[in-house]
From Swiss-Prot:
Function: Upon serum stimulation, phosphorylates CDKN1B/p27Kip1, thus controlling CDKN1B subcellular location and cell cycle progression in G1 phase. May be involved in trafficking and/or processing of RNA.
Protein name, per record: Serine/threonine-protein kinase Kist
Gene behind the chain: UHMK1
Positions of the RRM domain: 324-406
Organism for this UniProt entry: Homo sapiens (Human)
SUPFAM superfamilies: Protein kinase-like (PK-like) (SSF56112), RNA-binding domain, RBD (SSF54928)
Subunit structure: Interacts with stathmin and CDKN1B/p27Kip1. Interacts with PAM.
Length: 419
């Protein structure tokens, strides 16, 4: 899908036209050496979700950087157009070109806007590590994405925490940034992966390329499994492992280091059944890429059969269209039908200030007794409500607002979260 061109100055304007619509540029989300990403919203359609505008070749980029930006755009566009339709891969809405001058085109991708990244989740975990529910959710979603793109012949080649983002609308993690991706058997990128998440064979290939030498073999989809193994180990341990995986100790016996990390965590919380995760991670981190477990096979790990429950921190950090309000109703309201109906109506009226409420549930019995579940039409309204309702006073009590998985809510599964 191609859009019409338009002219920009040194900074993007507040509004731009693409695909026959007017878009408002609201804020910059991030920038790198060859691209910047902005939050945009379609004007005249307040119900439409915001998007992410990825602009390659920012103003002032010339020479090798300009060539790299153009190359990255072509790589990412080709991969995303081929891989569209999978729930764990970022959605591409369209492609268009803007012009700073007649000879300086700037390519743009319009993508779905996603939420928190795994990198941010690791920061929030404060070196304690993520919950097993979070790790399982992330591992399954990323493996589903990898199984699909590997089946299509693609290698992502830059899997890292910053490139795994949560989708509030789809309630899953998604892969982004396919600028280094390549077709297996046709590796046209010399330097792949990010330091700390780079597979041994990619490390060797990069070193040879820097020395002007050609590698005998190309990297395969196994490099993505290595990266995921490191990511999962970081999520479990709460530690960045860049220096660990480059150490001589790791190269001598990585299995023993993984065992030590899991043993140390078990001392803190002996109730965590973590050995299946340990074995899964080990199967991804073989130095020999031919021994690494493929993504499709990894999805059959016993780790994914364990029914973990989320911690309350998980439900605060991962937005969904469903809001859960705690500390609102006490037993007196639940046991008096008239008072119960009055307070439920009051809560619904307050929640509707932030967007259309699809449904509202206040269970009188466990599980979920006294909790308020509010389903909004979209996650944007739910996020606004969560931000503004948390800490509010209701009937003399401070309200605690978390999100809640829409899939579980629809099934009537009101599990007890862990503190």
């Amino acid at each position: 899908m191609a859009g019409s061109g338009c002219a920009w100055g040194a900074e993007p304007p507040r509004f731009l036209e693409a695909f026959g619509r007017l878009w408002q540029v609201q804020s910059r989300l991030g920038s790198g050496s060859s691209a910047s990403v902005y939050r945009v919203r379609c004007c005249g359609n307040p119900g439409s979700p915001p998007g992410a505008l990825k602009q390659f070749l920012p103003p002032g980029t010339t020479g090798a950087a300009a060539s790299a930006a153009e190359y990255g755009f072509r790589k990412e566009r080709a991969a995303l157009e081929q891989l569209q339709g999978h729930r764990n891969i970022v959605t591409l809405y369209g492609v268009f070109t803007i012009h700073f001058s007649p000879n300086v085109p700037s390519r743009c991708l319009l993508l779905e806007l996603l939420d928190v990244s795994v990198s941010e989740l690791l920061l929030y975990s404060s070196h304690q590590g993520c919950s097993m529910w979070m790790i399982q959710h992330c591992a399954r979603d990323v493996l589903e994405a990898l199984a699909f793109l590997h089946h299509e012949g693609y290698v992502h080649a830059d899997l890292k925490p910053r490139n795994i983002l949560w989708s509030a609308e789809n309630e899953c993690f998604k892969l982004i940034d396919f600028g280094l991706s390549f077709k297996e058997g046709n590796q046209d990128v010399k330097y792949i992966q990010t330091d700390g998440y780079r597979a041994p064979e990619a490390e060797l290939q990069n070193c040879l390329a820097q020395a002007g030498l050609q590698s005998d073999t190309e990297c395969t989809s196994a490099v993505d499994l290595w990266s995921l193994g490191i990511i999962l180990l970081e999520m479990f341990s709460g530690m960045k492992l860049k220096h660990t995986v480059r150490s001589q100790e790791w190269k001598a016996n990585s299995s023993a280091i993984i065992d030590h990390i899991f043993a140390s965590k078990a001392v803190v919380n002996a109730a965590i059944p973590a050995y299946h995760l340990r074995d899964l991670i080990k199967s991804m981190l073989h130095d020999d890429p031919s021994r690494r477990i493929p993504a499709e096979m990894a999805l059959c790990s016993p780790f994914f059969s364990i029914p973990f429950a989320p911690h309350i921190e998980d439900l605060v950090m991962l937005p969904t269209p469903v809001l859960r309000l705690l500390n609102v109703l006490d037993d007196d309201y639940l046991e008096n039908e008239e008072e119960y109906e009055d307070v439920v109506e009051d809560v619904k009226e307050e929640c509707q200030k932030y967007g259309p409420v699809v449904s509202l549930l206040v269970p009188k019995e466990n599980p979920g007794r006294g909790q308020v579940f509010v389903e909004y039409a979209n996650a944007g309204d739910s996020k606004a409500a969560q931000k503004l309702l948390t800490g509010r006073m209701f009937d003399g009590k401070f309200v605690v607002a978390t999100f809640y998985p829409l899939s579980a809510y629809k099934r009537g599964y009101l599990y007890q979260t862990l503190l």
